[in-house]
Structures are given as structure tokens and as C-alpha cells.
């Protein structure tokens, strides 16, 4: 809810020129996930326009209401990011007037070898690689070009500590996060001259259904809210 404060101006004072602060536009993919939702809520404030993407429409709508209650404007979209043609069209739409100030490429999925260690199934591996790598590169490359042309912007790519060392229970996930880590680091050097920053975020275990589905211990488990504050 927005609050208005009345200002009394005497005849001896010059009228105050009160202008609306410019909207800061933040795009977050995977906003219905634990980290994505916590990030959206953390950034929600007056003067912020949140563009939220997620696959669960009901959860996305509830998140939008919570963010609006903190004063943010929200725009929601729900589609499968693995449809890269639709993804690139959406990214182009976002940049028609001006590209976002901040893009958080957060969407992703995880698979594992199973409780019995039977191994990952190719169908799941293919879906993971399409979402975690292909869609991330498609989105970031589409918006990075517009930011570069404008001469400003910030991109955050959510990787993982698993990018440093392949976890035996999640080999494909580890490989995908290593890929986007390398991509973000390379992109950072290319875009620096155009005043576009690139941050590669490397969270550890964060409490979520995705994390819970992984077999084995989860040391140093963080809440999504704590992770969002640090990010």
C-alpha cells in the first residue's frame, strides 16, 4: 500500500517540485521457485516494476499480490522457457521501449540418479539441458544486446556451487551450472566496456522442493529468504 504525506508550504517557501521517481524494471525468471519468489519479494518496493515469469500461474498470481502490497508494479507471464522461439519473442517484447535495468536468469531444474543410484534418464537430462543452459543463453543473449545498445544494465545468472565440482548424485545439473557459470564469466568481459554488468551467483543448498528431492545430506542449508538477501 502506498502512503501519501501531506506537506504544508508557507508563502515564504518556494513550491517543491515533487516528481515520481523513475521505475526500475527487474525481470525474474523461475519466479515460482523458492529462490525466484524470495528474490521477487525482496526487490518489491515503490518505484520498482517486476516482470515475473513462472510455470505455476496460481502461485505466480499470489506472488504478484504480495509484491504489489509492498508497492511494486507487477507483470506476470507463464510459459515453458524451453520454447526458445517464444522466449526470444518475449525478450524482444520486453526491450521494445527500453531493456530492463536488471535481468535475473533464475529458472532451472534438477534431476538426480535416484535413491537406488540407477542413474539419470536421458529424457530428463535433455529437458534439464534445454532449460538450464539453452533457455538461459537464449534469454540472456537477447536482452544483453539491448542493454549494450543502451549503454547500461545488470544481468545476474543463477549458477550453483555444484559448478565447481560435479556432484555424483546430480551430474547433469552440475554440468549445466558449470556451463552457465563459464558463459556468464565470458559475457562479463565482453559487456564491461558497454557499462553492462554480469554477476554469476553461486548458491549452495537452499531449502526448496527441488533441493528436498535430492538424495543425500544437505549441509549448510539456507532459507530462500536468506539467499535472496545475500544475492
Language-model features: locations:
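Conserved glycine-rich cofactor-binding loop
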Residues: 32-33
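Conserved glycine-rich Rossmann-like NAD(P)H-binding loop of the short-chain dehydrogenase/reductase
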Residues: 46-63
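Rossmann-fold cofactor-recognition segment
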Residues: 69-85
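Conserved mid-core segment of classical short-chain dehydrogenase/reductases
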Residues: 110-126, 169
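Active-site helix of classical SDR
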Residues: 140, 176
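Residue(s) in the substrate-gating loop at a strand-loop-helix junction
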Residues: 160
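C-terminal helical subdomain
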Residues: 193, 200, 216-231
Amino acid at each position: 500500500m502506498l502512503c501519501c504525506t501531506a506537506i504544508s508550504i508557507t508563502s515564504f517557501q518556494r513550491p517543491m517540485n515533487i516528481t515520481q521517481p523513475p521505475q526500475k524494471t527487474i525481470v525474474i525468471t523461475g519466479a515460482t521457485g523458492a529462490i525466484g519468489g524470495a528474490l521477487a519479494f525482496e526487490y518489491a518496493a515503490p518505484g520498482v516494476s517486476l516482470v515475473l515469469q513462472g510455470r505455476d500461474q496460481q502461485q505466480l498470481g499470489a506472488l504478484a499480490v504480495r509484491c504489489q502490497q509492498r508497492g511494486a508494479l507487477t507483470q506476470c507471464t507463464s510459459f515453458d522457457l524451453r520454447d526458445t522461439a517464444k522466449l526470444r519473442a518475449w525478450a524482444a517484447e520486453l526491450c521494445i521501449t527500453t531493456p530492463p535495468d536488471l535481468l535475473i536468469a533464475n529458472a532451472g531444474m534438477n534431476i538426480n540418479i535416484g535413491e537406488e543410484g540407477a542413474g539419470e534418464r536421458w529424457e530428463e537430462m535433455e529437458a534439464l539441458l534445454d532449460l538450464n543452459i539453452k533457455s538461459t543463453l537464449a534469454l540472456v543473449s537477447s536482452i544483453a544486446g539491448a542493454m549494450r545498445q543502451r549503454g547500461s544494465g545488470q544481468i545476474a545468472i543463477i549458477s550453483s556451487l555444484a559448478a565447481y565440482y560435479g556432484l555424483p548424485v546430480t551430474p547433469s545439473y552440475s554440468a549445466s551450472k558449470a556451463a552457465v557459470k563459464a558463459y556468464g564469466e565470458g559475457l562479463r568481459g565482453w559487456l564491461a566496456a558497454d557499462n553492462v554488468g554480469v554477476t554469476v551467483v553461486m548458491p549452495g543448498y537452499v531449502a526448496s522442493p527441488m533441493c528436498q528431492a535430492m538424495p543425500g545430506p544437505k549441509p549448510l542449508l539456507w532459507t530462500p529468504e536468506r539467499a535472496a538477501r545475500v544475492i
